[in-house]
Structures are given as C-alpha cells and as structure tokens.
Amino acid sequence: MKEYFQSIVKELFKNIQSDEFLIINFDAEESSFVRLNKGKIRQPGSVKQISVSLSLSNREKRNLKSYIRLNGSLKRDLATLIRTLNYLRRELPDLPKDPYLLFSTSIKSTDVSSTQQVFDDRENLDYIFSKIKSLDLVGIYSSGYIYTGLANSLGQFNWHSDYSFSFDYSIYNESNNAIKLNYSSKNWSNDDFDLILEQGIKKLSILSKPLQTIQKGEYTVYLEPSALNEILDMMSWGGFSYKANKIGTSPLHLLNKGEKSLHQSVSIDENIKDGLSANFNSDGFIKPETINMISNGKFSESLTSPRSSLEYSVDHNASSTSEYPSSIDMSPGKIAEHEILSTINNGIYISNLWYLNFSDRNNGRMTGLTRFGCFVVEAGELVAPINTMRFDDSVYSMLGDNLIGLTEKRELLIDSGSYEERSTSSARLPGAVINNFKMTL
C-alpha cells in the first residue's frame, strides 16, 4: 500500500506549478468483517478501500480541498486525481484568502509501520466458537491493517500503518436480556478472551434473577472502563480543545481556568505513541508522543490545532482541526480487581452507559441511561439486575470530590466504529468507584 501511495505522490507532484503548494492525505484499509448471530457465522466479508484528499494552496493563502475514493487501479486513479487537481487549480483564484491557513514547511518525514505478527483470523474464530457452543451470541469481529499517509510538494513523506482487531459482541439469556462485551487489541490472547467471556457469563447468570427496582437517589457505583469511556467521550466534546476553552464552550472551561479541579488521582494524556492513530496531522505537523491534558486533577495542556495557533497567537501541538483526542490514556489507580465489589459494599455495578448528553454543559454536567448488565451490589456481592436508570451528575463530582478510587487494571478500548472506514480512535482506561452518584429517574 505504501508503494501505491508513493507512485501517486511521484506523478502528482510532476504537475505542480511553482507558486502552488499541494498536500496529499492518504487513508486506506484492508479489513475482514465477520457477523455472528446465535453463535454462528452469518455474514463474512472483506473490505479494501483507498481514499485520497488533495489540498491545494497558493502564495495568497487561498486553499481548496477535494476528497476522492480510489479503486486501486493506478492508471485510472492517477487520471482521476490529475483531473481533480486541475479543477482545484481552476477554482482556487476565485476563493477568499484563509487568514488561518497554516501547514508544515519544515520537512519532517516519518515511517511508523506495524512490525507485530499478523494473527490468523480463522484460528481466532475457531477458538471463539470452541468457547461459545452453549451461548446465544451476537456480534461483529473485525480485523486488519489501517494505513495513513501524507506527502507535500516540499518533499515531506509520512507513513503510518497498524494492525488491530475488535470483537464487539453480546451474549443473551433465555429472557432475551444481554450482557455486552468487547475484546479489542493489537495482539490476540486466548487467555484475555477467556477472562472477558467468563466474567460476562457470570454476569449473565445474575441477569436471569428477578429485576430489582431501585429508587432515585445517590449511590456508590462502579463504572467499568466501557462506562467510564462514555463519560470521557462527553468530556472530549470540546473539553480539551484550546479554542473551545478560549471562547467558553468547553465543558471543562472551569477546570481550564483553575476554578474547579478533579481528584488528584486523575491524570489524562493524549498518548499517540501507544495508540492506533498516526503521529502526524493532515497539515504535515508531527504530533508529540504524549500530551498531558490533565495532571493530578489539574488542567495541564489543551489540544491546539495549527489554525488555533494563528487565530490566538499561541504555539500548537499538531492537534487536528477538531482538537479532539484520538488516543486517551488515563492513569491507573490503586483498587485491585478483586477489591472492586468490596469497595462498593452496597451500591450499583454499572457495565455500560448510553444516550449521554449534557444537562449543563457550562458546569460539566451530563445525563444518560444505564445499559446492559447493571446490578445491585449488597455486602460486596452482585445480587440482582436493576431497572434502567437515568443519571445526572457533574464530572467535577464523578471524577472529583466523589471519586473513591480508580482500578489498578486498565482496558484498551478500540473504537469499533466502521462508518466509511474503521476507526483509529482508542482509549486505555481504568474503572472508577464513585460515591454519591446521582440517579434521577
């Protein structure tokens, strides 16, 4: 795939005029997908797709972009790309100047190619089926390479490739109630899969017990990493963005100003080095390996795009234009896995949350529903499933004053989204035990 991109780059740059600057961004994947239902393969398939965006600029800071799907035939694709380039060139003079246009002019080429051993999907699926014979399982197994490339007409060339998989699935009991599970990583481990499945089966057995209705109020709860990920995803809607904090639309703007703080055990990084996303942005700037966004409960550094750096006269850290994290890494705590239930003692175990939204964005307050495998805990034991409940609480409470602690063990959660293409977003998170968690309905 890299050689294919290099061939495109070589030919396109032959067509660039002296007063033009061209950036070529390349995205591709070679993926396998297997849909399972009732523990059997129902729909296997594979996807190989290539996309290229051309960004043409001139000395007057005019810029125009075009996004093209390619078919893998170099001759036909080059003809399409050259026609597109000519279209951009023709339209460019009629566009207004872009005062915040900024791209890298210092040549910093990189090549980060996956060196891990590629696993056999058939072997993995055979192993899965050997373990789920008696289970009603529904899910999607996806795996394969994801490629990202960039080249500009100054001679910079960047390449990133990574191999990963995601098995996103649910297991059902006879009453059609489900436990949702996910196993995703860069390397398959039978032991890791067994552990996740065994924990799911144990929860499924408790899910068969009569539903226990709980009343609205404040509870001690445990948020599994997948549930905590929903909270952090909401925090990321402008929370770490320099521009959003500057104009006051960030849900963490009070944290950014120093008017609020989180628990001192909370540290959150953008960890590009250990994630799946590329270490360069679409303008050719190289991202730091790690950006410490929250340190010991205090706001540390925003994600700042090149556009924001020009608009507000500050340094940038090669963030994307959206200034949204793609590889969240939250530091672990001190609660051992076998201590989670005893730490809750009496409360609620929450496996998943969904339908989250802000109830008071200015104060970092959000609301959402419990989902899939949430249980009453009594005397440190899971005793019964609960009715669906709505929570409404502030991040400054959940990860601040009311945070009892984070778990020692963390999980890598790879975004299983595949709209248009497989996602490269990921999060490595602990679980969280929280006191006075507010259930409202």
PLM features: what roles do these ranges have?
Residues 255-441:
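Dual-mode signal for accessory low-complexity, basic/Gly-rich regions
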Residues 1-278, 286, 295-298, 381, ...:
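Active-site bordering "gate/hinge" segments
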